[in-house]
């Protein structure tokens, strides 16, 4: 906590502190704490910020986050990779909509950000996603392994994890620590567009959230016709990065040995769905790509 507060007070964290303040200034934080049930897993979630509020914030944040890469021509710079990612995503989103029919109205979108040294991907509330080219190229992903990554990110969105993380941040009084509601409110309104990026992407998921996303993501991929065994092979590749040290973003995932066992168990559980999907016509759902406004 102290380290986070030092970062918030630093120049790099100034905008982020303003964003946290926006939650209070604009009434996104309610006075009475509330809990709800995870729409996918049934787990009880703290929800001071509603899913719709998180979706609204993420929509603006997504545009802001992609703006530098778009300006530099790094969004969907490789048309073949972009088409590959979008095609897989459309199959996965069709299965996501089966989980939660109301998500058919989400503005689903995925882009590939050209960044050869970045092994990462993210999803925001409302189905706004990005995958970095480095994770595809460095790990030499098969379609099934790529489907596991995208399915995992979709699962975070389906499970309202962005809103949950925003709520946990509020409950920890981050928005009230040392920052007064002073200055031009129009500035707060402008920086509020990036709120979803800060709390929806930069704050890490809890291990409970990661475990949920593993399970739901593997099931989505299996239903879409992608071999669930790819989850374990993907994990082995990721864990072998950087001379045996997994990427930093895996730090909140379960321990390697236990996660490997769990992924294998889940693969066995969902294999019948995969076998069924292989002999059927797999549906798709429209997903916007990098050329979308």
Model-identified regions with their sequence ranges:
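A Zn2+-metalloprotease active-site environment signal
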Residues: 2-293
């Amino acid at each position: 906590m102290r380290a986070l507060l030092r970062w918030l007070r630093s120049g790099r964290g100034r905008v982020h502190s303003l964003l946290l303040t926006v939650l209070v200034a604009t009434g996104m934080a309610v006075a009475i704490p509330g809990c709800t049930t995870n729409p996918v897993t049934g787990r009880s979630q703290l929800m001071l910020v509603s899913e719709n509020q998180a979706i609204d914030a993420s929509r603006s944040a997504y545009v802001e986050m992609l703006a530098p890469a778009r300006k530099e021509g790094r969004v969907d710079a490789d048309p073949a990779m972009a088409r590959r990612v979008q095609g897989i995503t459309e199959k996965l989103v069709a299965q996501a909509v089966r989980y939660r029919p109301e998500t058919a109205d989400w503005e689903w979108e995925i882009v590939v950000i050209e960044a050869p040294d970045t092994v990462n991907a993210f999803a925001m509330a409302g189905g706004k996603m990005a995958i970095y080219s480095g994770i595809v190229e460095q790990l030499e992903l098969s379609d099934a392994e790529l489907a596991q990554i995208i399915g995992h990110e979709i699962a975070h969105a389906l499970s309202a994890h962005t809103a949950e993380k925003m709520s946990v941040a509020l409950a920890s009084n981050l928005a009230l620590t040392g920052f007064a509601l002073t200055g031009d409110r129009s500035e707060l309104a402008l920086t509020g567009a990036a709120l979803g990026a800060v709390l929806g992407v930069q704050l890490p998921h809890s291990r409970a959230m990661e475990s949920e996303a593993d399970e739901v993501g593997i099931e989505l991929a299996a239903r879409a016709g992608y071999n669930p065994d790819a989850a374990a092979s993907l994990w082995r590749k990721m864990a072998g990065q950087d001379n045996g040290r997994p990427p930093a973003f895996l730090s909140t995932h379960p321990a390697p040995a236990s996660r490997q066992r769990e992924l294998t168990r889940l693969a066995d559980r969902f294999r019948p769905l995969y076998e069924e999907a292989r002999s059927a016509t797999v549906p798709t759902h429209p997903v916007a790509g990098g050329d979308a406004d």
